[in-house]
Amino acid sequence: METETKTLPLENASILSEGSLQEGHRLWIGNLDPKITEYHLLKLLQKFGKVKQFDFLFHKSGALEGQPRGYCFVNFETKQEAEQAIQCLNGKLALSKKLVVRWAHAQVKRYDHNKNDKILPISLEPSSSTEPAQSNLSVTAKIKAIEAKLKMMAENPDAEYPAAPVYSYFKPPDKKRTTPYSRTAWKSRR
């Protein structure tokens, strides 16, 4: 009996090895042809297993509003299904472009130098980015804090920072016109 070993292209093997570090079964599929539809891509992905979640992204504003962004995300039921999709689809031609299939990575919040926030990973689940962040303070506590701040500002106006001066139109204040405006005087100045 012979044992058949399946050889992977080097690129796909490195992509699959990255998957051992991944939690979940979420893939990023990029370099999508603008003519490929959400329906056709979903039907293609369903050949590899049960699709739990599929996010096909579109431009929300600007000149390309309503057009596909050129990438999507897909969650498979099992890791084996996701790995099989990577093996079969990465580098394959879909319409006029070669697909790029990778493990989806959690976005990392960029460090803002103005704030002392720590870098926090954003969840892979799209629902987490759409839900408002919950805080420990209730709405009424926030309102009371703002009212107290406004009251304090009204009682102690800051003398160091006076209000901005009224805009002047760079018109000499005391110079009054003694002659009427004439175009001939303007032409002679040129």
Swiss-Prot record:
The record's GO molecular-function terms, alphabetically, read: RNA binding
Q: Which SUPFAM superfamilies does the record match to this protein?
A: RNA-binding domain, RBD
Residue span(s) of domain RRM: 25-106
Q: Which UniProt keyword terms apply here?
A: RNA-binding
One GO cellular-component annotation of the UniProt record comes to:
cytosol
InterPro entries from the xrefs? Answer: Nucleotide-bd_a/b_plait_sf, RBD_domain_sf, RBM18_RRM, RRM_dom
Q: Where is this region: Disordered?
A: 166-190
- Pfam families recorded for this chain? RRM_1 (PF00076)
Full protein name: Probable RNA-binding protein 18
Species assigned in the record? Mus musculus (Mouse)
Q: Which gene encodes it?
A: Rbm18
